[in-house]
From Swiss-Prot:
Full protein name: Dihydroorotate dehydrogenase B (NAD(+)), electron transfer subunit
Described purpose of this protein according to its UniProt entry: Responsible for channeling the electrons from the oxidation of dihydroorotate from the FMN redox center in the PyrD type B subunit to the ultimate electron acceptor NAD(+).
Binding site for [2Fe-2S] cluster: C221, C226, C229, C246
Record keyword Cell cycle present: no
Native organism: Bacillus cereus (strain B4264)
Gene Ontology MF term list: 2 iron, 2 sulfur cluster binding; electron transfer activity; flavin adenine dinucleotide binding; metal ion binding; oxidoreductase activity
Encoding gene (name): pyrK
Sequence positions that bind FAD: R53, P54, I55, S56, L70, Y71, R72, G77, T78
CDD domains in alphabetical order: DHOD_e_trans (cd06218)
HAMAP family assigned to the protein according to its UniProt record, in alphabetical order: DHODB_Fe_S_bind
Length: 259
């Protein structure tokens, strides 16, 4: 159930170049039961920036009423958020959207989790949930360069983890698909979040597989009212049918929406 709450900053730190880990505390965490959902953050107390910022949920600790977000500080809004200190309050709306379907993966199966850049964070909570139900997980994390790699060790604690960097400064040189090819990775179900180019490459390979992708889109309202994040359906070539990333997604079965 979506709620709005002022949550307290437990901790915030930079964990890679311009990548921040923010831990917030509040009873809203009790509503976070679906990995892959996101929250909308009001980054400042004044009018500007006007729009909330959508940030995925990386980790949930309901015993402590805490959840973790990872985000890249690159625009005015997220740079402002990066200045928040322990004990300050942050206005949070969420949880929003439909997350990854855990029920599609069965105990004993292998799930491949593929993340690119700031699309990596929601896969961490997903991986923990899958491991808890007896699913074997394999992670492939793609980044531009070594300086922006994060959470490699945390993912490695849950299952086999591979890293690809475009410039080859860490892990496999190239893209996540190069890792799949180099290591002959096979799987029963695929979950992925990242840039459109990466998702298109995976869709081209695995249309016949059981696979789910999470779309990174700029959003306005976050609740399906403003129509700023619509995407068209592949089954309708006329382009008249669409779904909204924020409320119908952000997770969709692979092949359902036009990338």
């Amino acid at each position: 159930m979506m709620q709005k709450q002022n949550m307290i900053v437990v901790n915030q730190k930079e964990i890679a170049k311009n990548i921040y880990e923010l831990v917030l505390q509040g009873t809203l965490v009790q509503q976070m039961n679906e990995p892959g959902q996101f929250v909308h953050i009001k980054v400042a107390e004044g009018i500007a920036p006007l729009l909330r910022r959508p940030i995925s949920i990386c980790n949930v600790d309901q015993e402590k009423n805490e959840f973790t977000m990872l985000y890249r500080a690159e625009g005015q809004g997220t740079k402002t958020l990066a200045t928040r200190k322990q004990g300050e309050m942050v206005d949070v709306l969420g949880p929003l959207g439909h997350g990854f379907p855990l029920e599609e993966a069965e105990a004993g199966q292998t799930a491949l989790l593929v993340g690119g850049g700031i699309g990596v964070p929601p896969l961490y909570e997903l991986s923990q949930r899958l491991v808890a139900k007896g699913v074997r997980v394999i992670h492939i994390l793609g980044f531009q360069t070594k300086d922006v790699v994060f959470y490699e060790e945390k993912f490695a604690e849950l299952g086999d983890t591979y890293v690809a960097t475009v410039d080859g400064t860490h892990g496999t040189k190239g893209f996540v698909t190069d890792v799949i090819d180099n290591y002959g990775i096979d799987f029963d179900i695929l979950y992925s979040c990242g840039p459109l180019a990466m998702l298109r490459a995976l869709e081209g390979r695995y249309k016949e597989k059981k696979a789910y992708i999470s779309l990174e889109e700029r959003m306005g309202c976050g609740i399906g009212a403003c129509f700023a994040c619509v995407c068209h359906l592949q089954e309708d070539p006329s382009g008249h049918s669409y779904k909204k990333v924020c409320s119908d997604g952000p997770v969709f079965p692979i092949g359902e929406v036009v990338l």
